């Protein structure tokens, strides 16, 4: 599921080339997740990789709320024992604050997370020591209990 039509079309082409049966959906994540919750759909794995929600310091609180809300919805869609992976590419959001936001979202859903790892950019995505915001990619890997 992606809001970008071109990304969905490319994914469909790749799936067809590799002869994989995958359902690709062009939709807004918030709308689609709410629909899945209403329909009682649960998945073995949920991966959330939204666009940058915190664009500037003025939008920090609004961005945190979006991360919180999207992760609450995502957690409602993953079955107990399922894989839950969530990402942030907001440079102004620290890894600690990102993790705190995800844990808070899980608690509001009455869920616990068994956090397996908190990762970030790979070696092919370097950042300057004098510009910590360049280390903007954060990925939390967990089992949703």
Where are these predicted regions, by residue range?
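The conserved SAM/SAH-binding core of class I Rossmann-like methyltransferase domains
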Residues: 1
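S-adenosyl-L-methionine
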Residues: 4-47
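Flexible loop/turn segments at secondary-structure boundaries
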Residues: 7-8, 32-33, 54-56, 92-95, ...
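Short amphipathic alpha-helical segments
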Residues: 12, 37-38, 55-61, 98-99
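Mobile active-site "lid"/loop adjacent to the S-adenosyl-L-methionine
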Residues: 26, 43-73
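Helix-to-beta-strand junctions that scaffold the AdoMet/dcAdoMet cofactor pocket
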Residues: 78-80
